[in-house]
Amino acid sequence: MKKLILFELRKVFSKRLALIALIGIILFSALLSFSTFQNKYAFDQNIGKGTGKTAVEIDKEIAAKYEGILTDKKVQQMMSDFAPTSDLHGLSAIYVYQNAMQSAAFSRFSDKEGNWNGLSVSDVFGNEEIKIGYVDGWLSTSRNMVRVFVALALAVIIMLAPIFSGEYEGVDNIILTSKYGKTKCATAKVVAGIITAILTTTLIAAFNLLLAFVFYGTEGLDCSILFAPSDYVEAFIPFNITCGTLLKYQILLAFTCTLSVTGITLFLSAISKNQIVALVAAMAIFLFPVLLPITEVNPLFRLVGLLPIYHVLAISLLSVEQMSNGMLYAIWAIPAALLFLGVGAGISRRVLAKPQVS
């Protein structure tokens, strides 16, 4: 069985389209991370301004000045330090960007002229204890991971679509089933598909984390996502979790997504005699839920949000609920993924083990 699984894995990774998809994801990750890093901008009237690496260093230096638990005293200090020194020409100070810390402070505690709006920390965050620091780099990584993991799911579909349906177009199935039996061959394909999804997801997640460590260091992983610059979607998650926790959930959801689409793709590959049909159908099923007129506030989203596409569009699913044990509702993606994988793998194994004769 081990040799048969290795044989199936070699078949998956030796296909030109699969290699192109995998290399494409790696290059896309590198390009996205590098361009995000290079486009960083920060300004401070005492330190100076810069882009790219210089901007990151400026943001880190500013964050170090205020890091720790957010207090009303720190808010007043930031409002004073970052007060506009020139005419805003009608622009609201709430949306003016100087640096990451200034943007986080002004988007919550400033009026449109750049003065304190009268709100306290408890007015904005309730009884939550908000730890602040340099979070810009990790939130950029989180935002990029959404795009990367969507592409990853599509790549897994491309890699696995031919795993069963491709056998109808060749003689491999006849040779292997005569030697090992239909059940063993079907099981080997299912196991190879699961291993492919796990290995590919691990590789891409590790590569993106490595890039983040290289570009931004380790600062800020223990800081809250709630005190983030105004342009981050992560700020819409209404729960006081750290950047590290956010990334852990995202990577977990990347695995649940790829395992879910593995089950779907195995099923479609097994029932289809044409790998192109299996590929298109799997992609359509994966992407279709985003077209449904169901918003995050709709009670039905608690079910729709457990479909694979929303695992990687993580922000919506992570915003649903924080349960009494402190875990987020998104953890239900694990049993959902096991259901997709179990049903898809089970049916596809039966289809190949007992093919219908037309």
Regions found by a protein language model. Give the residues of each.
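Alpha-helical transmembrane segments of multi-pass membrane transporters/translocases
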Residues: 2, 18-21, 257-265, 317-358
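Secretory targeting signals
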Residues: 24, 28-63, 67, 92, ...
